[in-house]
């Protein structure tokens, strides 16, 4: 069985257009080790989410606002159309999306020792009104019951913290850190055209992140996924060929390629650029 799966992004979005508007607003492209999905709008969330993994954002169409709690203060982080952003682990965040927008989100599966938190605050403060810790397996199935519990709680009715605010001790604290600014994808490529001719260029990676996001230019690359999945995201005006286990796959621009764990392949970028993403735990 091949370790390569390729999906043409524009056609996939067109085929699933009905899922990018309320009440669904999102559609999962891949859902194994890497959770790769696109999100539409409008969707104005009231809750903040906390997790132990990192999240990669890219706004394909329109802008979004990622509400975050940065060093104890709530603020709006705007991710504009065409921008990328890597959210560090353990940072409280609340995505706010608008009509006629669509964005890519990539996150990893959780280890069985990792917990997520859904948290509601008192007004615009950073005071916790209601929170629940849980093990996330499916965001579509796991979050709605917790949100329903909040809207049926005394804390929601009174707007004040109470006996039901906390159900357990927090497994970990939110991270106290300065957040980076989003990166304009096309500007980054343009600024590194000369450098990428000599080999892959890091966009995100160590020591700041466990996730590795790399820019690849024209050329041949021996790639290995290792113990996790590897994404190859072909950019506009790009043509590439992937060879794996005796199979050859010719792929055009704006294709998302997933390489399964423990798989080796040869990527030949004939023209244009590719971005690779790996998210180890």
Swiss-Prot record:
One of its GO terms (cellular component) is cytoplasm. It is found in: Cytoplasm. The keyword NADP does not apply. Its main location: cytoplasm. Its cofactor is Fe(2+). One of its GO terms (molecular function) is 3-hydroxyanthranilate 3,4-dioxygenase activity. Pathway: Cofactor biosynthesis; NAD(+) biosynthesis; quinolinate from L-kynurenine: step 3/3. One of its GO terms (biological process) is anthranilate metabolic process. O2 binds at residue 45. Belongs to the 3-HAO family. Pfam families: 3-HAO. Substrate binds at residues 55, 97, 107. This is 3-hydroxyanthranilate 3,4-dioxygenase. The keyword Iron applies. Keywords: Cytoplasm, Dioxygenase, Iron, Metal-binding, Oxidoreductase, Pyridine nucleotide biosynthesis. Fe cation binds at residues 49, 55, 93. Catalyzes the oxidative ring opening of 3-hydroxyanthranilate to 2-amino-3-carboxymuconate semialdehyde, which spontaneously cyclizes to quinolinate. Residues 180-281 are annotated as: Domain B. Residues 163-179 are annotated as: Linker. Residues 1-162 are annotated as: Domain A (catalytic). Its EC number is 1.13.11.6.
């Amino acid at each position: 069985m091949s370790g390569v799966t390729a999906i043409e992004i524009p056609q996939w979005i067109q085929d699933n257009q009905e899922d990018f508007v309320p009440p669904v607003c999102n559609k999962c492209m891949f859902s194994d080790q890497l959770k790769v999905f696109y999100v539409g709008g409008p969707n104005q969330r009231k809750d903040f989410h906390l997790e132990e993994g990192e999240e990669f954002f890219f706004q394909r169409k329109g802008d979004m606002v990622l509400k975050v709690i940065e060093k104890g203060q709530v603020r709006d982080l705007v991710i504009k159309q065409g921008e990328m952003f890597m959210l560090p682990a353990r940072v409280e965040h609340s995505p706010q999306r608008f009509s006629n927008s669509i964005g890519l989100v990539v996150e990893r599966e959780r280890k069985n020792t990792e917990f997520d938190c859904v948290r509601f605050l008192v007004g615009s403060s950073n005071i916790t009104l209601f929170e629940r810790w849980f093990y996330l397996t499916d965001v579509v199935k796991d979050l709605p019951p917790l949100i329903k519990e909040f809207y049926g709680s005394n804390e929601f009715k009174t707007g004040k913290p109470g006996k039901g605010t906390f159900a357990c001790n927090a497994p970990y604290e939110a991270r106290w850190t300065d957040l980076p600014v989003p990166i304009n994808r096309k500007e980054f490529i343009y600024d590194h055209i000369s450098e990428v001719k000599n080999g892959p260029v890091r966009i995100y990676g160590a020591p700041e992140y466990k996730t590795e996001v790399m820019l690849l230019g024209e050329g041949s690359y021996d790639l290995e996924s290792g113990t996790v999945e590897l994404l190859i995201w072909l950019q506009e005006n790009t043509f590439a060929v992937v060879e794996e286990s005796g199979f050859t796959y010719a792929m055009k621009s704006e294709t998302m390629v997933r390489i399964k764990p423990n798989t080796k392949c040869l990527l030949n970028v004939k023209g244009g650029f590719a971005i690779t993403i790996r998210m180890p735990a």
